[in-house]
Design a protein with these regions (language model features):
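A structural signal for short secondary-structure junctions
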Residues: 6-8, 70-73, 85-86
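Histidine-centered active-site loop/cap adjacent to the catalytic His
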Residues: 94-127
């Protein structure tokens, strides 16, 4: 709200988390195992009530953006993180959580293609 109050017409893109196979349907925290790969810490059921998996975080972010757009904020966009780095990209998560340089490069290229396309949030319509 603070950003939007000061900049009502500025395009804002809410990007949900990219893929992390260990945390897609399990809540965190994530910690590195002995191999240096990140896994979620299993917790008793009573400690998982209300905890957020990546899938749930994406759902909630999408809902908030839809609500804000319905309330008149047409400059707010939602981008599912899998559009930038999804299931086909997991080989570029050497520790299971963080992309390597090739993964970050691909994410940047995909974001530019999305955001600066003529119909994208930062694009300029072709006259």
């Amino acid at each position: 709200d603070t950003i939007r109050d000061g900049h009502p017409d500025t395009p804002i893109v809410v990007i949900s988390p990219i893929i992390c196979p260990a945390a897609e349907d399990h809540s965190g925290p994530t910690l590195p195992n002995l191999d240096g790969r990140f896994d979620v810490v299993e917790r008793p059921d009573e400690l998982t009530v209300g905890a957020l998996s990546l899938e749930r975080i994406r759902e909630l972010l999408a809902i908030v953006v839809v609500q804000r757009r319905a309330a008149g904020d047409s400059n707010l966009q939602y981008l599912h993180g899998h559009e930038l780095f999804g299931a086909a990209d997991v080989d570029d998560l050497p520790d299971g959580l963080h992309p390597n340089s090739a993964g970050y490069q691909r994410m940047g290229e995909r974001f530019v293609s999305y955001a600066f396309a003529p119909s994208g949030p930062f694009g300029r319509p072709v006259a």
